[in-house]
Design a protein with these regions (language model features):
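Extracytoplasmic/periplasmic solute-binding protein
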Residues: 144, 148-163, 179-224, 246-255
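Extracytoplasmic/periplasmic substrate-recognition and gating elements
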Residues: 268-343
Length: 426
């Protein structure tokens, strides 16, 4: 019977060896199949899908997977909670490509998150980039993604609040407002009506930097909020809303948050003289808002591959829509989703200039870019400012609300300011 036991023993060793080899083989195949995850929201899902597919085609053997924050509020909140838990536990997606304007934000205040060790510093990677050319980008906007650790966020699209008029329709074409004080003093009805039409945007863009995130304190004071609310409500009452049905006849060319469509309209009217300007802030310049940004999760185990995706995303070939050739008559990243800046202006100044067909549009873009003195990322602070204006304006119109009583008006401002301070310190 001993020989049977011996055979069983040998068979056991052989089986164990086979299983061990099988397990090692499975582990090896798992290690080879690396998957890079890219987190997107409803505002960036289209671009994210194009980037994921294009980059994967150029890098055979490397798979990408989109982690989507859905548009539905309930589903989005559940996904955001899940992602935040993963990130805090040392995991989470490798790459973030997010719309700063999304109502459902993974990072409620991206600028604040930059100081929380969430994002990977990118300077060393950028110095060895194969495709992106940061020297061609708007340096003021790019700098907004930098902390004492280095570049941690890459702005992709930005905008400012701007207007373009047919010069011949203005009452005093030689007196175009270039400061906040001049805006409030301007008596041109055409300018007044359009500046006042979206007063909550004007209120928002009238401030420069709102906070010092490193020191975790507000830069604007409670008195600043009160003064601006009073100025904007008075301005709105001076120019009631009544957009004309025929905007061309009224002399308006374009207005709102500047993007590719804004400058296309400027191009359309380039056969005649145009007056183009950005809404000024209280710091003597122009405030830009980042509309889309990209970053790498500090927890990623694939930092080189993660940066390669950003390098692809922000390459001239992808931003321009030209794409990269691969295979037989195939192109990675060839798309019209990204350019000429739908939803914002490309951080790549060179390509943004090339997208403008007329010299008028090129000059306007260059001038407004040169006036940027503050770059903000939409946050709860912005939401408080916009809501504050709405509350003050509605109260003024009602004639018996909080705003018409000076003490109650100050209390309204004070409560908003306290909420902003709490948000900054959390």
């Amino acid at each position: 019977m001993k020989w049977r036991k011996g055979i069983k023993k040998v068979a056991g060793f052989v089986l164990a060896g086979i299983l061990a080899v099988g397990i090692m083989g499975c582990q090896g195949s798992q290690e080879e199949e690396e998957i890079l995850t890219i987190c997107v929201d409803s505002g960036t899902e289209g671009i994210g899908s194009m980037i994921a597919d294009g980059w994967s085609n150029l890098n055979e053997g490397m798979k990408t997977d989109l982690v989507v924050i859905p548009a539905d509020e309930t589903a989005a909140q559940a996904k955001i909670k899940e992602l935040r838990t993963e990130i805090m536990s040392g995991g989470g997606p490798d790459v973030f490509l997010l719309s700063a304007d999304s109502n459902q934000r993974l990072f409620e205040d991206p600028k604040k998150t930059m100081y929380s060790d969430t994002f990977l510093p990118l300077d060393d990677y950028m110095s060895d980039a194969k495709h992106m050319k940061p020297e061609e980008w708007n340096q003021t906007v790019l700098e907004s993604g930098r902390t004492e650790e280095g570049q941690v966020v890459l702005p992709v699209l930005y905008s400012y609040y701007a207007f373009a008029f047919q010069t011949s329709r203005l009452e005093n074409p030689g007196e175009i407002p270039s400061s906040l004080e001049e805006i409030f003093a301007c008596e041109d009805p055409l300018i007044g009506e359009y500046v006042a039409y979206f007063p909550y945007f004007a209120m928002l863009y009238s401030f420069g930097e709102l906070a010092d995130y490193q020191e975790e304190k507000l830069i604007c004071s409670e008195e600043d909020l009160l003064k601006r609310a009073e100025e904007m409500v008075a301005y709105k009452l001076k120019y009631p809303s009544k957009l004309p049905s025929n905007t061309e006849a009224e002399g308006i060319v374009a207005y709102g948050e500047a993007d590719g469509t804004f400058f296309s309209n400027v191009d359309r009217f380039s056969g005649e003289e145009e007056t183009v300007f950005a809404f000024p802030n209280d710091q003597g310049g122009v405030t830009a808002h980042v509309k889309m940004y990209a970053a790498i999760n500090r927890n990623t185990e694939l930092p080189d591959q993660a940066f390669a995706v950003l390098d692809f995303l922000l390459s001239n070939e992808v931003i321009s829509g030209e794409g990269f050739p691969y295979g037989e008559d195939k192109w990675a990243g060839r798309s019209n989703r990204f350019f000429p800046g739908l939803g914002g202006i490309s951080v790549n100044q060179t390509l943004a200039q090339e997208a403008c067909r007329s010299q008028t549009a090129k000059d306007a873009l260059k001038k407004m870019n040169s006036q940027i003195t503050a770059v903000r990322y939409p946050s709860i602070l912005d939401q408080e400012i916009q809501q504050l204006y709405k509350d003050c304006h509605l109260s003024e119109l009602s004639g018996n609300g909080e705003y018409t009583n000076e003490a109650m008006r100050k209390e309204l401002i004070s409560r908003a300011y306290e909420r902003m301070e709490m948000q900054l310190s959390e």
